[in-house]
Amino acid sequence: MKKWQFVGTTALGATLLLGACGGGNGGSGNSDLKGEAKGDGSSTVAPIVEKLNEKWAQDHSDAKISAGQAGTGAGFQKFIAGDIDFADASRPIKDEEKQKLQDKNIKYKEFKIAQDGVTVAVNKENDFVDELDKQQLKAIYSGKAKTWKDVNSKWPDKKINAVSPNSSHGTYDFFENEVMNKEDIKAEKNADTNAIVSSVTKNKEGIGYFGYNFYVQNKDKLKEVKIKDENCKATEPTKKTIQDNSYALSRPLFIYVNEKALKDNKVMSEFIKFVLEDKGKAAEEAGYVAAPEKTYKSQLDDLKAFIDKNQKSDDKKSDDKKSEDKK
């Protein structure tokens, strides 16, 4: 697992440098805010959090956001254990994860921070795979189609080299739900998305899937595949098709926050406000797609209402205590 201490450009060395230099414009804005909020989770969401922290650190040199990228599933495990304040996720929380949180009396808030399109790509030299439907993808990743000819009789009789994220990734869960229909993924699995990209670029018969941002970063070495299903015509992932959901493998990206952390940790609540007020700009900079503006506005309104409600509750408790002390 790669762990980043995000305060600016993410790596620990950069964190120390930013602290020594005052975090760029540190000292302005809400510079009296001090403390830390801890998170972990999706490697897909991680680049967005990185971009957000580059902006956050400019005005909050003493308010640190530390986040790992252990994968969505592993992030939720830590969230359930109470080890972190927030979990980054590239899929919605599962029912069994909700139940475990409920069993521990942990309440949470879900925030949609961006949109993504799981991109299917083949080797740049592949000159025959331009589009696939979900049934063909399922045949490839279930192992039933062993050669390209098994997928389409007009294609070469060459063995397919299919690569997938491993089960710790939300991208794996999303693909399993959207494409596999409960069948097991029988392909080479890797925890490192960059290794999946590398495998496809090095193997002429390679095929892999990953977040849109990983394709954007490597599009000179990969060939994207149009995807279709019964609801969507063959479409490639673009900012437009991902945002309007006309791309068949579009999905939202999330940050889940412990309600107690929102109430008690000013760094956590201010950071989430900052995320929503950014309105997806950091997501766009990281190669993903902003959600519709109304999504950020409605969530920000809900967050402010939640914070105000709890502040009033705290004030009332304080007043009640003072009254009790006077008796």
Curated annotation (Swiss-Prot):
Keywords: Cell membrane, Lipoprotein, Membrane, Palmitate, Phosphate transport, Signal, Transport. A lipid is attached at C21 (S-diacylglycerol cysteine). One of its GO terms (cellular component) is plasma membrane. It is found in: Cell membrane. GO terms for biological process: phosphate ion transport. The keyword Cell membrane applies. Residues 1-20 form the signal peptide. GO terms for molecular function: phosphate ion binding. PANTHER family: PERIPLASMIC PHOSPHATE BINDING COMPONENT OF PHOSPHATE ABC TRANSPORTER, PHOSPHATE-BINDING PROTEIN PSTS. The complex is composed of two ATP-binding proteins (PstB), two transmembrane proteins (PstC and PstA) and a solute-binding protein (PstS). Part of the ABC transporter complex PstSACB involved in phosphate import. This is Phosphate-binding protein PstS. It comes from Staphylococcus aureus (strain bovine RF122 / ET3-1). The gene is pstS.
